[in-house]
């Protein structure tokens, strides 16, 4: 345990070896064993001279399974070092002293290789062995099984030839069929590709034709619309000119009629003079009315909310200034 290892506190009780329990002769188990013939100091079982010491209990302070360390400590053979480091070197020294250095070195190297192979990926490799039925250990060669050749008669030979020819014919026919089928499939594929290319070309041509046709129609529509607009404008202008001419003609005719009437009836001009005097009088009245104060027979102002009270105050002041003739004379510079 180094300084970097985890620190574990061990707590020992008052009786770690549990001697009080083992020395207590008043318990039921002790009395029952004495009735069966057991005496203190003897071992249990058939052999009474066996070990009678207490069992040692170790505290488990790791996450390994039960018996993991014991399995590692077990030695498979005399060359297995287990957990003890440097034991293989010690065994080589002993072998050198005993004159068996080569044997021990070969055995240790073999064990090292097996440990490397078996420890990889957690897989246990099993070496395959040669079957005894196919390997001859004496001659160190594979066994060869030779069958006795039967005597073949002439008829059998002819039958074999005929059957061989028949097989050859069948194989040729199958090959020819397969070749013909492959050629047919190739021809079909070529025809399909040609047809697809032709269809694509025709579709492209049709699209181009439609585009051209649509473009021409669009241009014709635009040209027609422009012509219609021009015609409408010209018609409007002609109508306006005609209306203006008719108005002028009517005005001229009215003037001529008036002039002819005035020559025939000189008194017809009098009402016009009267109308002029009336218009002048109306102008004078309006100017005087502006200077004169208006009638103050107005109803009392209605109640106004507080929000518009300031604005209504200014409006009243303006109205009062307009109603005052002196203020108006000062404004218009009238003396």
UniProtKB/Swiss-Prot annotation:
GO CC terms: nucleolus
Gene Ontology BP annotations: rRNA processing
Localization (cell): Nucleus, Nucleolus
UniProt entry tagged with the keyword Transmembrane helix: no
Keywords: Nucleus, Ribosome biogenesis, rRNA processing
Ranges in a coiled coil: none
SMART domains: G_patch
Chief location: nucleus
Ranges of compositional bias, category Basic and acidic residues: 183-209
Family recorded in the similarity comment: Belongs to the PINX1 family.
PANTHER family noted in UniProt: G PATCH DOMAIN CONTAINING PROTEIN, PROTEIN PXR1
Function description: Involved in rRNA-processing at A0, A1 and A2 sites and negatively regulates telomerase.
Name of this protein: Protein PXR1
Native organism: Eremothecium gossypii (strain ATCC 10895 / CBS 109.51 / FGSC 9923 / NRRL Y-1056)
Record lineage: Eukaryota, Fungi, Dikarya, Ascomycota, Saccharomycotina
């Amino acid at each position: 345990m180094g300084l970097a290892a985890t620190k574990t506190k061990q707590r020992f009780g008052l009786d770690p070896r549990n001697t009080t329990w083992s020395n207590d002769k008043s318990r039921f188990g002790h009395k029952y064993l004495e009735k069966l013939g057991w005496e203190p100091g003897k071992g249990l079982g058939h052999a009474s001279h066996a070990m009678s010491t207490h069992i040692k209990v170790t505290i488990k302070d790791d996450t390994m399974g039960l018996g993991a360390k014991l399995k590692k400590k077990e030695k498979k053979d005399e060359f297995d070092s287990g957990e003890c480091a440097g034991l293989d070197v010690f065994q080589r020294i002993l072998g050198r002293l005993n004159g068996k250095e080569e044997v021990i070195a070969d055995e240790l190297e073999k064990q090292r290789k097996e440990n490397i192979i078996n420890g990889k990926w957690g897989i246990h490799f099993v070496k395959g062995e040669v079957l005894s039925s196919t390997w001859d250990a004496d001659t160190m060669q594979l066994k060869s099984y030779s069958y006795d050749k039967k005597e073949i008669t002439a008829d059998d030979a002819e039958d074999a030839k005929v059957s061989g020819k028949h097989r050859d014919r069948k194989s040729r026919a199958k090959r020819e069929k397969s070749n013909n089928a492959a050629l047919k499939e190739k021809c079909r594929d070529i025809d399909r590709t040609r047809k697809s290319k032709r269809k694509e070309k025709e579709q492209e041509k049709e699209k181009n034709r439609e585009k051209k046709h649509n473009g021409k129609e669009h241009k014709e529509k635009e040209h027609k619309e422009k012509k219609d607009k021009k015609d409408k404008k010209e018609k409007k202008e002609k109508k306006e000119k005609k209306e203006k001419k008719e108005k002028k003609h009517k005005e001229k005719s009215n003037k001529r009629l008036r002039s002819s009437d005035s020559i025939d009836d000189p008194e017809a001009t009098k009402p016009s003079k009267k109308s002029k005097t009336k218009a002048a009088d109306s102008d004078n009245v309006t100017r005087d009315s502006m200077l004169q104060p208006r009638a103050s027979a107005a109803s009392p102002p209605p109640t106004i909310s507080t929000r518009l009270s300031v604005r209504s105050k200014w409006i009243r002041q303006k109205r009062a200034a307009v109603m005052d003739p002196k203020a108006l004379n000062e404004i218009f510079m009238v003396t």
